[in-house]
Amino acid sequence: MFLLITYPVFDPVAISLGPIAIRWYALAYIGGIMLGWLYARALLKSEKLWGGPAPISGLQLDDFILWVTIGIILGGRTGYVLFYNLDFFIRHPAEIFEIWKGGMSFHGGFMGCVVAVILFCRKHGLPILSLGDVATAVGPIGLFLGRIANFINSELWGRPADPSLPWAMVFPNGGPLPRHPSQLYEATLEGLVLFTILALMIRAGALKRPGLVLGSFITLYAMARIAGEFFREPDPQLGFLWGGLTMGMLLSAPMIIAGLAIICVAWSRGPRAPVAQTISTPDVSTKADRD
């Protein structure tokens, strides 16, 4: 006989104010945005980290966070529709807009973030790679909170585990089998571990090389996601794909190549040259991070 950990049943509503109900996943988004904004402001205040003035002002950062947030939400929903449940949404197109029912994709959200960063930088004449560094430096905060919300909601649980595994647990909607708490594995790898590695890199001067933090985030996230997928139950509407691979694995594999390519570019360009910061510099090329 093995003693399994009892999954703590949580109320899906985190905060209830009369007719307004805030669910855990929404709270994770709000918390991720606020904590990410605070961390980004702290990074921008230190000229030592950048080797000179930061690439964006505090005032511009507020607008930047808004653009990135919109990109993540639109991209995350679009990615889920296209990658994970296209047949369903073709039959029920109106439900595409019902995001409060759940259904977001990291890979779609990341692509939406990339588009938002590029558009914002082109509009304001700011360096794309350096602002990509800012966005991805804070990314693990939101990833950690999002995975914790997945655990609280008893969703995206893991594959069946050996009953002798001390932390195996039975999820309310996961059947009678003990399972890996894969949400906590991913929260640790994609959140805590990734944040720690990037923070140590930043402390060692990574922000002085535009794109180095961005490329490292992409590469390390993809590796962490693929590792986590070995313990995570595939989405029921998709199941296992070619050779036992999951959709998460297939979407993450190209990210490793892209991330390594960005790291090579960042390293070959060398440290950024100190520049005088301005509120708006439309005549500056967004393709250069060292001008």
Swiss-Prot record:
GO molecular function annotation: phosphatidylglycerol-prolipoprotein diacylglyceryl transferase activity
Residues at which a 1,2-diacyl-sn-glycero-3-phospho-(1'-sn-glycerol) binds: R147
A Pfam family assignment: LGT
TM region positions: 24-44, 64-84, 99-119, 125-145, 187-207, 211-231, 247-267
Entry GO CC: plasma membrane
Keyword flag Cell membrane: yes
Location (main, coarse): membrane
GO biological process, one term: lipoprotein biosynthetic process
Tree of life domain: Bacteria
Entry's localization field: Cell inner membrane
EC number, UniProt record: 2.5.1.145
Membrane topology recorded in Swiss-Prot or TrEMBL: Multi-pass membrane protein
Pathway given in the UniProt record: Protein modification; lipoprotein biosynthesis (diacylglyceryl transfer)
UniProtKB keywords: Cell inner membrane, Cell membrane, Membrane, Transferase, Transmembrane, Transmembrane helix
Role: Catalyzes the transfer of the diacylglyceryl group from phosphatidylglycerol to the sulfhydryl group of the N-terminal cysteine of a prolipoprotein, the first step in the formation of mature lipoproteins.
Family: Belongs to the Lgt family.
Protein name (database record): Phosphatidylglycerol--prolipoprotein diacylglyceryl transferase
